[in-house]
Amino acid sequence: MRPVHKRNNRADTPAITAFAITSPMTSPVLAFYRGTGTDAAGPRIAQIWAWDHRRLEMVYDFIQWLFPLADPSRFNPDAPLLTTADIAAFYADPALQEDARRSLDLMLAFLGLRRGGATVTRGNEFPKLAAGWLEPANHNHLRLTRMLLFLSQIDLQAEARGLLACLEDIAGHEGAGKIQLRTLEFWRAAVPTAV
């Protein structure tokens, strides 16, 4: 079942007001993250973690599996929806959180970034790899929004804030004129402020 939506005041993003509860035993998200399920195209999570940068750029339907959200994807109708049961499982299971960090690290490396704890910085390959996504309206900006939202929902808010801080710094330097203000607003709306 799909979640029920209501608009909120925060950058006109949907606020989830109710979820259909999915048993953790049958959840496609948890089966995928635990390595017992595949995405709609067939690969298991460990196979995706082994993909090279070219494949990560060319394949579009895996990102909704690595970083699932409660909202249906307009680009991938077969993508699973993140449920409250899934979120609770990520909160409770350190192994699931570590696997989510591994998915994050995969995408950070693809973008030329790296993570140390919750801090995200430019990696050695940033100048070369940023050329592939540091341009106005690049589809990887949508991927980054999805990543930030997912991390914020599964108790990895520190990592989400670290990624956002790095993206804001990039937007003020190498990304000036390449990362649109609207994109920055979506990224900021995706990450809760520290308490």
Please annotate each region the language model reported:
Residues 19-124, 158:
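N-terminal leader regions that mediate targeting or early regulatory function
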Residues 5-12:
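Intrinsic-disorder-associated, low-complexity terminal segments enriched in Asp/Asn/His/Tyr and depleted
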